[in-house]
From Swiss-Prot:
Gene Ontology MF, one: methionyl-tRNA formyltransferase activity
Keyword Transport: no
Protein name: Methionyl-tRNA formyltransferase
Phylogenetic lineage: Bacteria, Pseudomonadati, Spirochaetota, Spirochaetia, Spirochaetales
Source organism of this protein record: Borrelia garinii subsp. bavariensis (strain ATCC BAA-2496 / DSM 23469 / PBi)
Entry-linked SUPFAM superfamilies: FMT C-terminal domain-like, Formyltransferase
Amino acid sequence: MKIFFVSSSFIALEVFKEILRHYEVVGVLTLPDKPKGRGQKLSQNVIKVEAIAKDIKVFDPLILDNNTLNSIRDLNPDLMLVFSYGKIFKKEFLDIFRMGCINVHPSLLPKYRGVSPIQSAILNGDCVSGITIQSMALEMDSGNILVQKKFKIRSYDTSYDISKLVSSLSPSLVLEALEKISKGFLGIPQKSSEATFCSFLKKELGFIDFNLSSFEIKNRINACNPWPLVRAKLDYSDIIFHRADFWEIDLYKERKVGEIVDFDPERGLFVNTGKGILFLLEVQRPGRRVLDFKSFYNGSRQLIGRVFSSVGGIY
C-alpha cells in the first residue's frame, strides 16, 4: 500500500514514523515554512524535516493548484492519511486515492467535529475524550468510523498534555485502521444527529474574569495551554497561568475574588473565585521560565492577601 501523508504538526510525528516502518510513503503534503523567533527566519515544521531526512517528496503549496495535483497523481498513491493539517480538501483531490482517505481526529466523533477538539473537551470540563480514525468525506469530520479509543482527562491536564497523549496513542490505532481497510472494512457511519462542533480558539479566552467559578477558570487555563495562555495582573505585573486545578466549595466567601487566600504545598496556590477555590499549579512571569507553584511562592514577596485583577477582554 502506497501512502500519501498529510500533516503540519508535531502531534502527527509518531504516526508518521510508525507508518514509515510499515508502509511505503510516496509523498508528504504539509504547510509552507513559517517565520519563527526574533529573527523571523523561515522554519520547517517537524513533519517536513522528517520527510526530507527520509528523502520523501514534499509538497508545501499555499494552494493545491492543478500542477500540484498532477504531481501527486503521478506518484500513484493508494491512500491518503491526514493528521492535523488544517485545510479542507475538494473532491477532485480526494478522488486521486483509489483506496480512499483517512483522518486521525482527536475526539470521540461525532462529538467535537472541527478544528479544536482537544481544547474544547478541556474547556467544557470533559472527563473522557478519545481518538477516532475516520474515512474522509466532503463534509468535515463526518466520515465512517474505522477505529475509536477512549482515554481519561485528568482535572489538571492541559491541551498540550492531551496532544502528547494523542500523539503516543495514535500510531497503533492507525495501523489497526489500515489493516481493516486492507480487508475491505468500510467503517461504521456516524450518528450525525449527535454531532457537536468546535471552532478556532480566540485570543480573548486568555482574558480571565475571577467572578467565574473555579471550575470554569480552571478549564480555561488548561485549555489555553499552549495557546493563547490565560493571564492576569498581580499589582502591576502580568502573570501567565499554565496549569490549574479547582475545588468548587466556597471557603472564603468574605474574601475578594481574585485574592490569593492560602498556600498548600500539596495542592497549590489558592485563589478565591466567584464560586470555589482555584488551585494555581504552574505560572510564569513574562520572559521568564515556567515555575511550579512552590517555586513561585518561595520566590515572591508576601503573596497571601494580594489580589489578581483581570486583564481586559471579552468574557
